[in-house]
Amino acid sequence: MAEPVRVRLVLPRAPRAELLATRAVEEAGQRIAFPRDTLAEVKLAVVEACLNAMEYGVGEVEVEVVAHPNDAHPWIEVQVVDHGPGFDASGVPKPVLEDKLRSPRKRGWGLELIRRLMDEVEITSQPGLTRVRMIRRRGGQ
């Protein structure tokens, strides 16, 4: 079996820096023959995770993309790490469309999108470190 494809990035807190992470996902996914539409969903989840890390974290954002070329069931794992104050992911309310449409604050869809687009999502957070680990299998969802 082939070795995993691993890419590590440190993103600056700069406009459009999250797009560097999407390029890494694209390259890694192509190497394990992920379908284009599946890669688009993974990239959207990664953008959301990176934007959250940049908005709520402190300093640089660390991203690791690993494409596992398992012959029968290849999968992509992405971890996004920030060093902000941390948060309780279980305390983030699930957005309700009708409420968001009436609210002046339309944001707050990021975690819900990530959870819907990926097969597995694990969030660990404490003061100084938040890690969002996401997995998507080819043929998943």
Model-predicted segments: where are they?
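Short, well-structured hydrophobic secondary-structure segments
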Residues: 45-46, 50, 54-56
